[in-house]
């Protein structure tokens, strides 16, 4: 259907260019449909983005929570390393996959260079997941404030998305 064509085209374009640098006309042209259908099906570019992002972010958030629950269930107090593996491994698996999962990873990396404000509406599941990881890390790192844990997780995520967005950059910078 036209709606599915728009979703697939938007996902590819958002992955390649981010949110700001993609127009509704460009999405419609890639989908080979009338641009008015973006408004008809989604209400606009922002809502289309939200649907595309949510469709991929929800499974990632769910897998992260499953990983965290497995770590906390098997051990009373998991290590920081185990918690961070639960945070990163689902994302790393996305990077090794082809198709929609890899597109989501690239889309996340590209929008990380933009302001995240347009993505906020699509992130309630990610917010809950982030909060659960912060809570788990705080139990392991009681000497750190909540803000310090949050910023450290942000920096970890930022370093990872930079590595995805600019392949080979971290290796080059390490020389």
Give the location of each predicted region.
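Transmembrane alpha-helical segments of integral membrane proteins
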Residues: 165-173
